[in-house]
C-alpha cells in the first residue's frame, strides 16, 4: 500500500485547478423539509445525490457533517459512505466534520475509523477538538500523517459561546487558543518529517481582527474557515483576517449554497457565486 500525497499538496493542486472552495454538506431536518424531502434515509440519499450532481468536480473539498447522517442510524451512515465515495471518484477531497475529542486510546480508534485505506470512511481529512489536551491527539495526528490525510483542530470557532473558553488565559499568560496554535505549529514543524502540514486549524471566518495574533502563531498550517454566507462573513472578511496567508485558507460555506436547492441548476448557480470569489481570493497570494 502506497501512502497518498499529503493532503496539503493535494489541496494546493486542486485549489489551482478548480477553486479552493469547500462545500459544507449539512442535511438538517429543516433543510430536508425545505427541499420537500422526507426526513429519513431515503430523503437524505436524494438530497446527497442532488448536491453531488450540482457540485460535480468543481470544488476542491467537501465537508459533510456526520451528525446529520448519524441521526438516521445505520442507513444514514451508509449514505455518508456513498457520498464520500462519489466525491472521491471525481478527485474531490473529503473532509469529514466529526469534531471528535477524547482520551488517547479512544482517539486512536476514531482515527482508525476515518483515516487510511480500508477504514470506514477513508476520509482525506477530518475535524477534531482538543479539550482533553493536544497530547491525547498525537496518535490521531500520526495516523493522519501515515495516511496522507490532515486533522483540523478547532482553535477559534465563530460561535460566540466558544469565546469565553478559547480566550481564557493559563498560568503562562497564553490563551487556550494561543497555546493550541503553538502546539499545532510545533507538531507540523517537528524536525525529520515531511514539511507538509498535517495539523490544520478551524478558524471561523467571522472572527475579529484581534485574532490575527492566533493566526500568526499557526505558521504554515492549513486554515479551514467556515462562516461564509449565512453566518455573515464574506470574502472581504477573509482578505482582512488572513492577509498574507491566502494560500493556506480553505474558504467554506454551507447554507448559502444549499438553501438554493432543491433545483440542481439553482444549486450550481449558488455554488458558482462562491467558486469565483474563492479563486480571486487565492490569486491575491501570488505575485502579479
From Swiss-Prot:
GO terms for molecular function: orotidine-5'-phosphate decarboxylase activity. The keyword Transport does not apply. Its EC number is 4.1.1.23. InterPro entries: Aldolase_TIM (IPR013785), OMPdecase_AS (IPR018089), OMPdecase_type-2 (IPR011995), OMPdeCOase_dom (IPR001754), RibuloseP-bd_barrel (IPR011060). GO terms for biological process: 'de novo' pyrimidine nucleobase biosynthetic process; 'de novo' UMP biosynthetic process. SMART domains: OMPdecase (SM00934). Keywords: Decarboxylase, Lyase, Pyrimidine biosynthesis. It comes from the Bacteria. It is an enzyme of class 4 (lyase). It holds the Pfam family OMPdecase. Pathway: Pyrimidine metabolism; UMP biosynthesis via de novo pathway; UMP from orotate: step 2/2. PROSITE patterns: OMPDECASE. It catalyses: orotidine 5'-phosphate + H(+) = UMP + CO2. Disulfide bonds: none annotated. The active site is at 99 (proton donor). HAMAP family: OMPdecase_type2. NCBIfam families: pyrF_sub2 (TIGR02127). PANTHER family: OROTIDINE 5'-PHOSPHATE DECARBOXYLASE. Belongs to the OMP decarboxylase family. Type 2 subfamily. This is Orotidine 5'-phosphate decarboxylase. The gene is pyrF.
